[in-house]
A protein has these predicted regions:
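N-terminal interaction/assembly modules
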Residues: 1-129, 133-142
Length: 142
């Protein structure tokens, strides 16, 4: 599995926990690592260069959570007849993360959208894939 795809999966898990628990995203990241590294000797410490840290996952989770209000407004403006709070939590966070990543402009939008659709196939359903594709396409086109 490609490293970036795995990082996106991990970021989605962190964002799901953050959204459901309303805890700070740093706490959700720490909880994720606690679960991932059940053996204390494998656990990353506070050093950013320690093996085992997933810097891309952390950047996606932190950046998405920091920009959530702006991103949510963009989602709402493109989703006709769908209030944000009525969207499934997984779908909402796939959208948030993809829109955040597109705003960074480091990865081509087509790649970000394809990755988001793959996450939707893994963690949601086919109806969600179509819905997410439509929203992301509309956001990308402006």
């Amino acid at each position: 599995m490609a490293a970036r795809h795995r990082s996106r999966q991990r970021a989605l898990q962190v964002l799901y926990q953050w959204d459901m628990t309303k805890q700070p995203v740093e706490q959700a990241i720490a909880s994720f690592y606690d679960t991932l590294y059940s053996d204390e000797s494998d656990s990353p410490d506070d050093s950013d260069d320690k093996p085992g840290r997933d810097e891309f996952m952390e950047e996606l989770a932190k950046g998405t959570s920091e920009m959530a209000a702006d991103i949510d407004h963009r989602i709402t403006s493109k989703s006709e007849n769908w209030r944000l709070e009525r969207m499934p939590t997984v779908d909402r966070n796939i959208l948030r993360m993809a829109i955040y990543e597109m705003s960074r402009q480091e990865t081509p939008a087509a790649v970000v959208i394809d990755e988001a659709l793959e996450l939707a196939r893994q963690f949601s359903g086919e109806e969600s894939v179509s819905f997410i594709n439509g929203i992301l396409d509309a956001v990308h086109k402006g």
